């Protein structure tokens, strides 16, 4: 019953988010029509639909860059240091040597992301507002400035899209900057968790662990449930995977799967993948595996070219299907996809999992001969 209620709440939340986006879009459209309707109507008569569509596509990409650039500028102005900048699936990272490199990374539910290393954490004095607000402020201000300088139909498309993107990020909803600002403004716990997440990401990009996070977390009680505090769950799961405690991974991931259907999409997908991996290894007869493979979120995730998806499928084909050959093919695929891991630490962990599975599979092949 609790799981059904959670699912109902999650569906209502998604519908509420969609309705709010539609209302914001309608409000922006009405205001634009009221102030600029007659002028734009005259211009539209002489404009190609193909050009307008191309303008929309280019404007979308530009506003993702502008949005993440706003986060970058806001962070630099308040003591943050650059870690990575992602637009769609193309990611620019700063290496430990100080150089830069490009690589591919897909993160469900996000068009881009600018991650930075925060300044040293000080209770009540942790800067977060300009870093978080920089994105939607950049979208809105750039849009207004552009249309003021060049008031034509193409810039109108650019400006309208930017204002809409800015407002839907500024108004607190689900998993956006406005919601982050609201959560951090209300709670020091959330501010501490954001600091830990950003600092941990900095070290993960260098292939190193950040054990200080456990010291920070031991000093507080996680008594809030939101997409910031939910991130701390994955620290425990990552540690268990690294230690090869796959039964404990199964137990914890299954508990979260059953109790937390309201998790944001990227988190929910990661829980589904981890549960498929651990259930396949530890409980290949579990009927839950079939349910997992029918979940649209997991189906979509397994299509992305990431090494952890290939290792999960290798575990499934080996233990559930008894198909060693296909399992080894997935492991070979996982090796090729290692550069697409979230960060260097995740890449190294995934390489260890591949070695572990390969050793088990090869031993099974030898015993079968």
Residue ranges and their predicted role:
Residues 77, 114-119, 173-260:
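Polar-ligand-bearing catalytic/cofactor-coordination segments
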Residues 238, 242, 261-313, 318-322:
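Alpha-helical adaptor scaffolds
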Residues 211-222, 246-260, 283-300, 323-335, ...:
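Alpha-helical repeat scaffolds
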Residues 267-279, 307-312, 343-366:
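TPR/TPR-like alpha-solenoid helical repeat scaffolds
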Residues 54-118:
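Small-residue-rich helix-interface/hinge motifs
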Residues 45-65, 154-167:
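Membrane-embedded alpha-helical segments that form the functional core of polytopic membrane enzymes
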Residues 111-112, 117-208:
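Hydrophobic transmembrane alpha-helical segments that form the core helix bundle
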Residues 1-56:
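Topogenic membrane-insertion module of multi-pass membrane proteins
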């Amino acid at each position: 019953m609790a799981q059904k209620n959670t699912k109902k709440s999650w569906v209502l939340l998604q519908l509420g988010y969609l309705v709010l986006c539609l209302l914001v879009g309608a409000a922006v459209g009405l205001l634009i029509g009221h102030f600029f309707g007659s002028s734009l109507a005259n211009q539209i008569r002489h404009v190609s639909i193909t050009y307008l569509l191309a303008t929309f596509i280019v404007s979308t990409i530009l506003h993702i860059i502008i949005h993440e650039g706003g986060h970058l500028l806001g962070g630099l102005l308040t003591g943050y240091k650059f870690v990575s900048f992602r637009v769609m699936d193309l990611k620019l990272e700063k290496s430990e040597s100080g150089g830069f490199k490009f690589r591919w990374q897909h993160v469900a539910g996000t068009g881009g992301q600018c991650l930075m290393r925060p300044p040293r954490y000080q209770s009540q004095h942790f800067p977060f507002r300009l870093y978080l607000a920089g994105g939607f402020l950049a979208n809105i201000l750039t849009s207004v400035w552009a249309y003021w300088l060049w008031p034509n139909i193409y810039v109108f498309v650019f400006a309208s899209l930017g204002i809409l993107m800015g407002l839907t990020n500024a108004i607190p909803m689900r998993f956006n900057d406005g919601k982050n600002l609201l959560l951090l403004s209300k709670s020091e716990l959330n501010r501490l968790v954001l600091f830990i997440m950003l600092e941990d990401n900095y070290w993960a990009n260098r292939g190193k662990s950040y054990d200080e996070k456990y010291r920070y977390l031991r000093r507080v009680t996680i008594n809030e449930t939101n997409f910031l505090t939910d991130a701390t769950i994955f620290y425990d799961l990552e540690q268990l995977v690294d230690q090869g405690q796959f039964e404990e991974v199964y137990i914890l991931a299954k508990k979260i799967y059953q109790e937390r259907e309201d998790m944001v999409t990227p988190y929910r997908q990661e829980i589904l993948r981890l549960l498929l991996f651990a259930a396949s290894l530890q409980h290949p007869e579990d009927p839950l595996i079939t349910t997992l493979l029918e979940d649209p979120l997991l189906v979509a995730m397994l299509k992305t070219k990431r090494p952890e998806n290939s290792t999960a499928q290798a575990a499934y084909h080996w233990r559930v299907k008894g198909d060693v050959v296909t399992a080894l093919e997935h492991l070979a695929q996982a090796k090729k996809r290692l550069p697409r891991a979230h960060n260097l630490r995740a890449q190294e962990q995934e390489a260890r999992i591949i070695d572990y599975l390969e050793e088990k599979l090869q031993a099974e092949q030898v015993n079968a001969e």
